[in-house]
């Protein structure tokens, strides 16, 4: 008989955990990773790459950990440190820096499809702030994911609800995305039929979907209730703005459940039959029945099951993703399909990484620290794996910067290291609009709450008066418009602080930033359009002509010093003798420092992570 899991027993099993490990307890794991890879390389008659120089290491680790190149001062600080473990010290410093939060937000933004707007439901700034807070506090990955899956309430007061509201109109797609993103479970086919290649069946899929059956995802186009409420005192635009953070919510709905579809074609269930929730397993045993006296707990049961230490897929999925982040290719590709672990390039390595993730209690920083301290990470890059062969990690794979790394590095050249501390936070503008009272979420019945809503709105306006007409100041005081139409220095912020995503014509999108319509959609392929933008774009011209590095170079007294500074800041190295001769000759022929900066920014050495 299938095993029965109760709500209380599952909770009890999940709270039994070991004490948090202190930094350094898992550093021996770095050597174990190296040993696993060396053994695999020998098995395939391959050799590890040579160690990287300090210059190569510092540029690589800055890009991989905080998403930008190092400044000249940061270079000086590193080389002034005479300690033997200065690389490890730098890794620790970067993992705890504000830049790491910014870089990880970009990485998760692509994975979680983070957008400013979810199809007319309004801004999702509370989600941005919530996610950045989790990263800043180094919230364990399992707890972060749990919070997104069990979140309830209004978007304006609980930013974590935005994850489920993202696909509110497509609950089955939402489950598919969740299982694919967090478990590497390729279940898309199973929505309509048994998977032709994996062990997933359509019944399995619906049994998992039923954990969300009692949850209502209310994603309302607030233009309709705004029309219902509108009168001469308040413009439609202001009403839409006011209602958006209040009418988007995740709630339990009594009596709601999941049924098999009317066209269900298999013999193991009947069309229209009520689905009994069951957990899928990967141990060869049958799915486990779930019993609970309160259907409201089903979503929590699912979240705790999915993120449990005993579920190897959850740990392996995020470990595989982080490995790809640092090495350019995952142990098991694609990262969205771990259904056949034996197909991984190195199954033993993937299992070890999954166990390591559990051992560090899903501490993402600590896991990254272990990877970054491996000899494997600190070896020279391979340009490309042999054609038709698996990449076996003699070192990282040579790869282009992501769009966000390129943008943030150029913004650094423009403004300096202060960019790591420049933050935008528009969540308070949403939070102040949350109604402090219950109201009808029914578009037709909301008219009964008109006076309560208007009385509350009056308290938000500085002069106590309602703005008249569509041109009124509005409750956001134009903040949403200002954020999209950034100009001059206000636009030179890190990618994490700009609208998510940027418009298609912006540097970031042309360079490969994800549209955030599907997960993991960012591109590092490059192309003619990106090359033309780097050569002729307005932002490149700004860096060439008005940036801090150009001004700093101009203050140097000799051409040699000027050229050396440009090389250190753009390429993280000193110019070679031939480089110096060519640059001096160019200056003597009438070119200036901005031309040298242009050449460096358009070099392969700048755009590739070596």
Q: What does each model-identified segment do?
A:
Residues 309, 353-357:
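Alpha-helical support elements that line or immediately flank enzyme active sites
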């Amino acid at each position: 008989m299938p095993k029965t899991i109760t709500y209380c027993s599952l909770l009890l099993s999940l709270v039994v955990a070991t004490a948090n490990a202190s930094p350094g307890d898992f550093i021996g794991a770095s050597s174990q990773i190296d040993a696993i890879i060396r053994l695999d390389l020998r098995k395939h008659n391959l050799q590890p790459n040579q160690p990287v120089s300090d210059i190569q290491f510092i540029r690589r680790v800055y890009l991989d950990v905080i998403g930008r190149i190092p400044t000249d001062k940061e270079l000086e600080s590193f080389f002034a440190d005479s300690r033997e473990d200065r690389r490890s010290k730098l890794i620790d410093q970067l993992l705890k820096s504000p830049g790491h939060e910014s870089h990880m937000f970009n990485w998760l933004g692509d994975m979680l499809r983070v957008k400013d707007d979810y199809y007319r439901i309004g801004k999702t700034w509370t989600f941005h702030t919530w996610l950045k807070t989790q990263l800043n506090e180094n919230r364990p990955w399992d707890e972060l994911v749990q919070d997104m899956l069990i979140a309830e309430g209004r978007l304006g007061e609980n930013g974590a609800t935005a994850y489920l509201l993202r696909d509110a109109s497509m609950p089955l797609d939402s489950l598919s995305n969740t299982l694919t993103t967090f478990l590497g479970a390729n279940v898309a086919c199973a929505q309509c039929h048994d998977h032709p290649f994996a062990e997933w069946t359509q019944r399995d899929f619906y049994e998992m979907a039923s954990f969300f059956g009692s949850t209502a995802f209310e994603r309302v186009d607030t233009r309709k209730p705004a029309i219902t409420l509108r009168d001469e005192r308040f413009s439609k635009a202001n009403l839409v703005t006011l209602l958006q953070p209040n009418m988007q919510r995740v709630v339990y709905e009594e009596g709601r459940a999941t049924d098999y579809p009317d066209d269900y074609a298999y013999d193991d269930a009947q069309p229209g039959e009520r689905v009994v929730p069951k957990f899928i397993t990967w141990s060869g045993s049958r799915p486990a029945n779930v019993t609970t006296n309160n259907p409201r707990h089903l979503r929590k049961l699912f979240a705790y099951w999915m993120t449990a230490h005993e579920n190897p897929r959850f740990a392996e999925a995020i470990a595989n993703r982080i490995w790809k982040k640092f090495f350019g290719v995952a142990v098991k590709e694609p990262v969205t399909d771990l259904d056949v672990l034996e197909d991984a390039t190195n199954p033993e390595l993937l299992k070890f990484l999954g166990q390591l993730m559990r051992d560090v209690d899903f501490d993402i920083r600590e896991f990254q620290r272990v990877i970054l301290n491996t000899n494997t990470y600190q070896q020279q890059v391979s340009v490309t794996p042999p054609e038709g062969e698996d990449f076996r990690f003699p070192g990282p794979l040579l790869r282009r910067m992501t769009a966000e790394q390129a943008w943030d590095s150029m913004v650094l050249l423009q403004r300096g290291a202060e960019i790591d501390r420049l933050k935008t936070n528009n969540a308070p503008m949403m939070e102040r609009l949350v109604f402090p009272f219950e109201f009808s979420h029914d578009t037709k019945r909301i008219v009964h709450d008109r006076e309560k809503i208007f009385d509350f709105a009056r308290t938000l306006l500085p002069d106590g008066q309602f703005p008249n007409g569509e041109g009124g100041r509005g409750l956001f005081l134009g903040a949403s418009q200002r954020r999209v139409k950034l100009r001059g220095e206000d636009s030179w912020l890190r990618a994490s602080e700009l609208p998510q995503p940027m418009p298609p014509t912006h540097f970031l999108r042309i360079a490969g930033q994800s549209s955030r319509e599907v997960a993991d959609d960012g591109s590092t392929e490059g192309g003619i359009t990106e090359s033309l933008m780097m050569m002729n774009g307005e932002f490149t011209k700004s860096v060439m002509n008005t940036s801090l590095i150009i001004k700093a170079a101009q203050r140097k007294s000799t051409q040699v010093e000027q050229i050396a500074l440009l090389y250190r800041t753009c390429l993280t190295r000193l110019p070679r003798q031939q480089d110096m001769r060519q640059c001096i000759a160019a200056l003597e022929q009438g070119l200036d420092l901005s031309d040298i900066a242009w050449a460096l920014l358009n070099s392969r050495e700048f755009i590739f992570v070596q």
